[in-house]
């Protein structure tokens, strides 16, 4: 790891770098309040000639960097860096000083190369990149109502409705102080993830789903990150919904770590241990999660199961708030759906009847007793002590 104090103009400027916002990072989320706070800080710096401190910018080099250009994958500071570039684009688009316009465009926003991969100095996240490139290229007719465009327009309005000296504002931005932190992890990507966890622990709290996504998508290859994101993670989120990721991973782990149980608040730590102890590749885990998510969507009603009998009983289980059954249902769906569908119908109906009777004697919290029953059945199925059929499940429930 290497840390250096720098001016932002040294960090962004030059002809040998492209900044990459990886898919494991949040999308661009700065709102008007964030932008106005930065704007006021920059105006104060311009008026007082005191450099504004922008904070740390943490990154690591991609192994796919070319001979002429280095790809720097951002771990922290991407929201601030993106916003600074939006302000620079707004200055470029409102100044009448052609020298300043060209200086900003050619040294801070774009690279003078034919290779499209390196043309724009910042590659925003996959969902933001088109809007960001349109702003940098001046294709304003192509812009939608993205957050990037909203903030760009805010800065345009500030510049066109005031008597701000464009050159002085640019100088204030260029003079901003940062700490440039190059993680230099080589192949030790655990360092990247550890730093990510620590720097984000002081900001907006990340969900277990955020942390797991970051863990699975972190790579020293931008190409692999994008493949993992678009071919696996996005599809998982589409199947079950972003807000359901933590409980989905929890139920997945109840299967993978059976018979061990753990608190839902420990899901990220248990996931890291599972990835390490079972010696699974990230691609293998993503593929398995995608497979399970195709069934889990029925359990959270993101999509109604095409089998009407199963769908009816799933609705009853959901109505009874029996989420403790989800891990067992997920395992049953994964092993039986489309192969033993008639038998699965019978078992899901059995579970719906069981939980209804269970609610007559227990409250809706489920509790350790129900979790224990479910855990024992999962464990016996995995160990092949019982089979995936109605009679075996009935016997286990009857003797619980």
Where are the regions that the model predicts?
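Glycine- and hydrophobic-rich flexible loops that cap the catalytic core of alpha/beta enzyme folds
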Residues: 2-261
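A cross-family structural signal marking well-folded subdomains
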Residues: 178, 184, 205-400
């Amino acid at each position: 790891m290497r840390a250096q104090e720098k001016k932002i103009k040294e960090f962004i400027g030059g002809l040998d770098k492209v900044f990459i916002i990886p898919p494991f990072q949040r999308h661009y989320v700065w709102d008007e309040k964030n932008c106005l706070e930065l704007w006021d800080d920059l105006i104060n710096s311009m008026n007082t000639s005191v450099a504004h401190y922008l904070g740390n910018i943490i990154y690591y080099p991609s192994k796919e960097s070319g001979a002429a250009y280095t790809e720097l994958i951002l771990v922290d500071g991407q929201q601030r860096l993106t916003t600074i570039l939006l302000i620079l684009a707004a200055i470029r688009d409102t100044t009448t000083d052609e020298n300043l316009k060209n200086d900003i465009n050619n040294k801070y926003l774009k690279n003078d190369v034919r290779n499209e991969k390196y043309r724009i100095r910042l590659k925003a996240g996959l969902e933001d990149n088109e809007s960001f490139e349109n702003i940098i290229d001046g294709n304003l007719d192509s812009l939608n109502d993205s957050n990037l465009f909203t903030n760009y327009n805010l800065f345009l309005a500030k510049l066109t409705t005031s008597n701000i000296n464009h050159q002085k504002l640019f100088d204030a931005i260029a003079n901003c102080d940062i700490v440039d932190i190059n993680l230099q992890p080589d192949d030790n990507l655990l360092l990247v993830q550890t730093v990510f966890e620590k720097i984000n622990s002081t900001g907006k709290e990340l969900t277990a789903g955020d942390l797991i996504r970051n863990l699975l998508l972190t790579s020293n290859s931008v190409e692999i990150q994008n493949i993992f994101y678009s071919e696996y993670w996005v599809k998982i989120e589409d199947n079950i919904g972003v807000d359901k990721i933590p409980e989905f991973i929890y139920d997945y782990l109840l299967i993978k770590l059976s018979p061990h149980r753990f608190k839902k608040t420990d899901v990220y730590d248990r996931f890291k241990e599972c990835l390490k102890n079972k010696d699974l590749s990230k691609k293998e885990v993503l593929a398995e999660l995608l497979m399970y998510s195709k069934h889990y969507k029925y359990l959270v009603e993101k999509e109604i199961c095409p089998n009407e009998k199963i769908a009816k009983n799933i609705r009853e289980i959901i109505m009874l708030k029996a989420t403790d059954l989800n891990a067992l249902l997920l395992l049953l769906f994964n092993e039986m759906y489309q192969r033993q569908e008639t038998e699965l119908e019978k078992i899901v109906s059995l579970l719906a009847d069981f939980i209804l009777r269970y609610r007559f004697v227990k409250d809706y919290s489920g509790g350790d007793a129900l979790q224990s029953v479910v855990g024992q059945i999962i464990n016996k199925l995995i160990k092949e002590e019982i089979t995936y059929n109605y009679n075996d499940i009935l016997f286990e429930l009857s003797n619980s």
